Amino acid sequence: MSKQTAIEQDGVILEALSNAMFKVELQNGHVITAHISGKMRMHYIKILPGDKVKVEMSPYDLTKGRISFRYK
């Protein structure tokens, strides 16, 4: 996603899946699967169901994304 323009949206974590994957409900009502970005893994940032997050998605596949920020 570095060379293309990533689509950023806010969402809420619905459920935690295996391998640091999460189901995220976006503001527009769509539910996608997303994984944690590398920097968040490196700094041990915990994400729990109910947390508000910022998700980056590729314009080519809008069903998968990367969690880049957790709001406080």
Curated annotation (Swiss-Prot):
GO cellular component: cytosol
Entry-linked InterPro entries: NA-bd_OB-fold, RNA-binding_domain_S1_IF1, S1_domain, TIF_IF1
Main location: cytoplasm
Locations listed in the record: Cytoplasm
UniProt keywords, alphabetically: Cytoplasm, Initiation factor, Protein biosynthesis, RNA-binding, rRNA-binding
Protein's UniProt keywords contain rRNA-binding: yes
Residue span, S1-like domain: 1-72
Keyword Transport carried by entry: no
Domain of life of the organism encoding this protein: Bacteria
Molecular-function GO terms, alphabetical: ribosome binding; rRNA binding; translation initiation factor activity
Record's function text: One of the essential components for the initiation of protein synthesis. Stabilizes the binding of IF-2 and IF-3 on the 30S subunit to which N-formylmethionyl-tRNA(fMet) subsequently binds. Helps modulate mRNA selection, yielding the 30S pre-initiation complex (PIC). Upon addition of the 50S ribosomal subunit IF-1, IF-2 and IF-3 are released leaving the mature 70S translation initiation complex.
Complex formation: Component of the 30S ribosomal translation pre-initiation complex which assembles on the 30S ribosome in the order IF-2 and IF-3, IF-1 and N-formylmethionyl-tRNA(fMet); mRNA recruitment can occur at any time during PIC assembly.
HAMAP family noted in UniProt: IF_1
Family to which the UniProt record says this protein belongs: Belongs to the IF-1 family.
Name the UniProt record assigns to this protein: Translation initiation factor IF-1
Annotated source species: Porphyromonas gingivalis (strain ATCC BAA-308 / W83)
Name of the gene: infA
